[in-house]
């Protein structure tokens, strides 16, 4: 039973570790659903993090239907993760019909070598989550991150529970999207899942001397993983 934290900065990754997370999913652009992190962020986090590090591989926002050039970008990013000694990668690719893009996934998983693989929330916008789950198992993925095809894991609790039953011991189903200390126990009871995914973020005040009078989207407050929020979720998961 444990918590994976989605982190989009060095500070967030270290806060996740300090709060007791079992694993970090490192990404960039978390407010846009997450993208592949920068090389610098990845390298520094890898140097400083002691818990397992998985890296989101997603070259752009939008759907999960990728052309050949985008798959090649992703493959090279996966290779970078291998070179830096990451523990795993977080992948997902669909075809235009909403099914798993098996050739793309096989190419990426081959590039990952011995790294672990999580199939991400592409399952939630697929045509058939149950079929995607079977494909993820066949591909050798360790886990699937899902909100149960809803905006939040709490809303998708019934679908997540069905996926947990379908998966059995073959693969881990990890609820994510809106997971917090306020709902993690309900999600645990309602789904039977054993690991959960959250960003556990809180606001960080801008250090700029004064707000700009005309520009509000640059240089302001931002969100960062909060040690106390992580610890609260972890403690609830450790409660019998």
UniProtKB/Swiss-Prot annotation:
Q: Where in the cell is it found?
A: Cytoplasm
This protein's major location comes to cytoplasm
GO MF, one term, reads:
copper ion binding
Entry keyword Cytoplasm = yes
- What are the record's GO terms for cellular component? cytoplasm
- Could you list this entry's UniProt keywords, alphabetically sorted: Cytoplasm
- Please name the Gene3D superfamilies in this protein's record: Copper homeostasis (CutC) domain (3.20.20.380)
InterPro entries on file? CutC-like, CutC-like_dom_sf
Record family assignment: Belongs to the CutC family.
Name listed for the protein in its UniProt record: PF03932 family protein CutC
Q: Which organism is it from?
A: Xanthomonas campestris pv. campestris (strain ATCC 33913 / DSM 3586 / NCPPB 528 / LMG 568 / P 25)
Q: What is the lineage of its organism?
A: Bacteria, Pseudomonadati, Pseudomonadota, Gammaproteobacteria, Lysobacterales
């Amino acid at each position: 039973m444990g918590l994976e934290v989605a982190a989009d900065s060095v500070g967030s990754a270290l806060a996740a570790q300090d709060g007791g997370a079992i694993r970090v999913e490192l990404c960039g652009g978390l407010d846009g659903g997450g993208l592949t992190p920068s090389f610098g962020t990845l390298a520094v986090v890898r140097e400083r993090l002691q818990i397992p590090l998985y890296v989101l591989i997603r070259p752009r926002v939008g759907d999960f239907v990728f052309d050949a050039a985008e798959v090649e970008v992703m493959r090279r990013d996966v290779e970078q993760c291998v070179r830096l000694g990451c523990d795993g990668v977080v992948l997902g690719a669909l075809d235009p019909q909403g099914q798993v893009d098996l050739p793309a996934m096989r190419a990426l998983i081959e590039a990952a070598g011995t790294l672990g693989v999580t199939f991400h929330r592409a399952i939630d916008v697929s045509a058939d989550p149950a079929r995607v789950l079977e494909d993820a198992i066949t591909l050798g993925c360790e886990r699937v991150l899902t909100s149960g095809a809803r905006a939040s894991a709490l809303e998708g609790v019934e679908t997540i529970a069905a996926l947990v039953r379908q998966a059995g011991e073959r693969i881990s189903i990890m609820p994510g999207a809106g997971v917090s200390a306020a709902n993690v126990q309900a999600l645990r009871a309602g789904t039977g899942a054993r690991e959960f995914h959250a960003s556990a973020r809180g606001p960080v005040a801008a250090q700029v001397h004064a707000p700009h009078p005309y520009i509000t989207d640059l240089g302001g407050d931002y969100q960062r993983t909060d040690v106390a929020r992580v610890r609260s979720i972890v403690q609830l998961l450790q409660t019998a």
